[in-house]
UniProtKB/Swiss-Prot annotation:
ATP binds at V18, G60, V61, G62, K63, T64, E65, D255, E321, R393. Keywords: ATP-binding, Chaperone, Cytoplasm, Nucleotide-binding, Stress response. This is ATP-dependent protease ATPase subunit HslU. The keyword Hydrolase does not apply. SUPFAM superfamilies: P-loop containing nucleoside triphosphate hydrolases (SSF52540). Belongs to the ClpX chaperone family. HslU subfamily. Transmembrane segments: none annotated. One of its GO terms (biological process) is proteolysis involved in protein catabolic process. ATPase subunit of a proteasome-like degradation complex; this subunit has chaperone activity. The binding of ATP and its subsequent hydrolysis by HslU are essential for unfolding of protein substrates subsequently hydrolyzed by HslV. HslU recognizes the N-terminal part of its protein substrates and unfolds these before they are guided to HslV for hydrolysis. InterPro entries: AAA+_ATPase, ATP-dep_Clp_protease_ClpX, ATPase_AAA_core, Clp_ATPase_C, HslU, P-loop_NTPase. GO terms for molecular function: ATP binding; ATP hydrolysis activity; peptidase activity; proteasome-activating activity. One of its GO terms (cellular component) is HslUV protease complex. A double ring-shaped homohexamer of HslV is capped on each side by a ring-shaped HslU homohexamer. The assembly of the HslU/HslV complex is dependent on binding of ATP. It comes from Colwellia psychrerythraea (strain 34H / ATCC BAA-681).
Length: 443
């Protein structure tokens, strides 16, 4: 779990996301509070529940990007889901409890990778011995000490060659565990546990088998290391650690929550399952026990972060019980032309850097002047104002339109240096930006 301070978290988010300081502060404090809670004694720790967050803001201002970056910083089980993917119990579609099941699967994968990394050195040694056994079968009992001594010396010579990579391309035949059979079983809602048990049964049936395979030594080493590491780690410990990680540090990000709201002034009809999904979410957010194939998981201390544009609805259109479970409200601001300039230049691997690097692979040197970047930002803002405001996503459309001709003819323009300045931007984008109909359909 991450022990970064709120200031460090915000600084890290700043290198990828422009503006939205309130949202960054809120998620930074929430993430730090996860660490603070784990420092308390057990009795008090159980009483401290997470303060769930609702992020409100127009599309394309950074809500989802904050979630993506937070997932990398958290070092904890993290899942991002779309609220629109779920339906209430009894309707065809995914039930909300699958969120926790998917989170548990993710935690198992995280803990397994961590444990296998911990025993990596032992696994490498065991894999090395198995390779040497294939190259130099052990001497049989009954041979004299001299033969065994010679065998040991030869083994050391081959070990040295193996570590130096001199045997990498040599092909050997060895026994490897058969790959697990992937069995996908479709089941009616509410019977996911039964399907997971059947899947485990089929996988266990195939896990004991071994196959003879011919591989190059460098590929065989990798396969054997994974096999040996899987033997060393304790699967029951992995399962328990993963469940603890989900219960104590798990984070669920629910995007597009506004799409399951029903407007207060709307009449009946429409999607009958919208309010049902909200009611199904309530027990998870408040705290309940969910059955998964790895064991029972309590959701009392899982942090939930919800986000939505709320263009057609308002946060107050959420059912009151769910509103009460999302006590921290953060409003993200619409982006201005100045924000667009910063987005094009400041973040790590900004859009301009990406296009410069992509075209450089074909020998085309591209530079963006300050007035060129300002012209791109102004054009994007203008189209957002006159048509639909899709935030920073408009920049992707503008940039693609701008370098379309360059990208198509890059192989014929190798060695050229192209400067994208205000005149270049105006020449390509001005007609489309001015014509509202063209903007609506092209940009």
């Amino acid at each position: 779990m991450s022990n970064m301070t709120p200031r460090e978290i915000v600084h890290e988010l700043d290198s990828h996301i422009v503006g939205q300081s309130d949202a960054k502060r809120a998620v930074a404090i929430a993430l730090r509070n996860r660490w603070r809670r784990m420092q308390l004694d057990k009795d008090l720790r159980n009483e401290v529940t997470p303060k769930n967050i609702l992020m409100i803001g127009p599309t394309g201002v950074g809500k989802t990007e904050i979630a993506r970056r937070l997932a990398k910083l958290a070092h904890a089980p993290f899942i991002k889901v779309e609220a629109t993917k779920f339906t209430e119990v009894g309707y065809v579609g995914k039930e909300v409890e699958t969120i926790i099941r998917d989170l548990a699967d993710m935690a198992i994968k995280m803990v397994k990778e961590s444990e296998m990394d911990r025993v990596k050195h032992l696994a490498e040694e065991a894999a090395e011995e198995r390779i040497l056994d294939v190259l130099l079968p052990p001497a049989r009992d009954g041979f004299g000490n001299d033969e065994k001594s010679d065998d040991s010396n030869t083994r050391q010579i081959f070990r040295k060659k193996l570590r130096e990579g001199k045997l990498d391309d040599k092909e050997i035949e060895l026994d490897l565990a058969a790959p697990q059979v992937g069995v996908e079983i479709m089941a009616p809602p509410g019977m996911e546990d039964m399907t997971s048990q059947l899947q485990n049964m089929f996988q266990n049936m195939s896990s004991e088998k071994t196959n003879k395979r011919k591989l190059k030594i460098k590929d065989a080493l990798k396969a054997l290391q994974e096999e040996e590491a899987a033997k060393i780690v304790n699967q029951d410990d992995i399962k328990q650690k993963a469940i603890d990680a989900v219960e104590q540090n798990g984070i669920v990000f629910i995007d597009e929550i506004d799409k399951i709201c029903k407007r207060a002034d709307s009449s009946g009809g429409g999607d009958v399952s919208r309010e049902g999904v909200q009611r199904d979410l309530l027990p998870l957010v408040e705290g309940s026990t969910v059955s998964t194939k790895h064991g029972m998981i309590k959701t009392d201390h899982i942090l939930f972060i919800a986000s939505g544009a709320f263009q057609m609805t308002k946060p107050s259109d959420l059912i009151p019980e769910l509103q009460g479970r999302l006590p921290i409200r953060v409003e993200l601001q619409a982006l201005t032309a100045d924000d667009f300039v910063r987005i094009l230049t400041e973040p790590f691997a900004s859009l301009t850097e990406q296009y410069i690097a992509l075209l450089a692979t074909e020998g085309v040197s591209v530079t963006f002047t300050d007035d060129g970047i300002k012209a791109i930002a102004d054009s994007a803002w203008q189209v957002n104002e006159t048509t639909e405001n899709i935030g920073a996503r408009r920049l992707h459309t503008m940039m693609e339109r701008l370098v379309e001709d360059l990208s198509f003819n890059a192989d014929q323009r190798s060695g050229e240096t192209i400067s994208i300045d205000q005149a270049y931007v105006t020449k390509i984008l001005s007609e489309v930006v001015k014509d509202e109909d063209l903007s609506r359909f092209i940009l």
